[in-house]
Amino acid sequence: MEEFKRYLELDRSQQHDFVYPLIFQEYIYALAHDHGLNRSIFLENTGYDNKSSLLIVKRLITQMYQRNHLIFCANDSNQNPFFGHNTNVYSQMLLEGFAVLVEIPFSLRLISSLKGKEIVKSHNLRSIHSIFPFLEDKFSHLNYVLDILIPHSIHLEVLVQTLRYWVKDVSSLHLLRFFLHEYRNWNSLITPKKSSFSFSKRNQRLFLFLYNSHVCEYESIFVFLRNQSSYLRSISSGTFLERIYFYGKIEHFVEVFTKDFKAILWLFKDPFMHYVRYQGKSLLASKGTSLLMNKWKYYLVNFWQCYFYMWSQPGRIHRNQLSNHSLDLLGYLSSVRLNPSIVRSQMLENSFLIGNAIKKFDTIVPIIPLIGSLSKAKFCNVLGHPISKPVWSDLSDSDIIDRFGRIYRNLSHYYSGSSKKMSLYRIKYILRLSXARTLARKHKSTVRAFLKRLGSELLEEFFTEEEQVFSLTFPKASFTSRGLYRRRIWYLDIIXINDLANH
């Protein structure tokens, strides 16, 4: 963003949102290809020789607006040396530059909305990290959760209409509309696939931007209600949630929606409401009754359809009771369970046994899916019995031990936020014995012989980083270190498991 300031007149761009003239500037394409702005992309890479010149951009846009553009390119590719077979390359570069342009108004508003706020200056935080404080909230006091599949736009014109609130440049919107409708492979740019969304590998930057702007509008109702009621803001998740972009739009939506929602706001003033978005779905947990959650369900459907023309159905929102439902987030299974407890009370000569049930929210390691993944990777059979890894038999002994140990350490690191880590001992057993069987197969020996000769060394490789730190910090207080290790620890570098830690 600092590089933009050297080339853009920020006051004029921020006031009028005119970005179309910038598409003819060479440095926009340098930014799109991560080139430095101090050099010309023409001199730095001969592959981009004269591709982003003003003349090419003008001719390409003019040619794109012709109805017979695709036919013309197919029939005249050999006779037109200026465009020729590279027309798709020019279109690709033009679209990449356009993706940078449409992000400018959003980036400027985000910077202005964050001024004066105490926010952690970290580039590693993402909106997905708001799941961690979401799982640390007081879920044991909540009753219901709405499992919402984010509505997707059936018609691409909805995406263009969404950007009209931010980009006032009509020419830019026309060009975006042409990009979306001209090329066949972009007609289904956002397609729902199970619970998530898939994007084309080409031009992923623009596709992700359009999808995020779409979700930004979808989540606007939560911004408004959160601003109206101080209870909607979770103290523990405030730092993370402030980094999610749609909270930068609070002032705008208050001005737009205040008059429309005064009559029905009383329905939704819930002192215990928690919201998070994960992939293609979002979760709304509340202490409210079943009737209140049903009101939320049908109100959200009507709100999306009437105000944003986003087609949705009540069947895409599932209401579940937390005591009978498990949340599947980031590979964890989270649920509220009842811990029975009996208290003995004595009054004078009479004693009473009082049964009490205490709610507790647990994040559990999904052991069965993990064993299934290990089985597919040929570390064990479907029942979880360890087997050897023949394809690794050609490696050295140290490499074999290191690979097995790294897989377990990464899995342990990923599931460090679990409240019950006992399941990881089974994974540790499978990988440790699988490593021993692989070594025994390589040296044509027995497993017992290798465990006897390399037992301590093999066991040390499976120590996790947390266990090593605690053992060094508390060498004599093993109980203290184990107690600390049992606590849930969330690491910000956790995004996804990469095929069993890229074995």
Curated annotation (Swiss-Prot):
Lineage of the species this protein comes from: Eukaryota, Viridiplantae, Streptophyta, Embryophyta, Tracheophyta
Keyword Plastid (UniProt): yes
Gene coding for it: matK
This protein's name: Maturase K
Protein location: Plastid, Chloroplast
GO molecular function: RNA binding
The organism's place on the tree of life at top rank: Eukaryota
Coiled coil regions in record: none
PANTHER family: MATURASE K (PTHR34811:SF1)
A single BP term in Gene Ontology: tRNA processing
UniProt record similarity statement: Belongs to the intron maturase 2 family. MatK subfamily.
GO cellular component: chloroplast
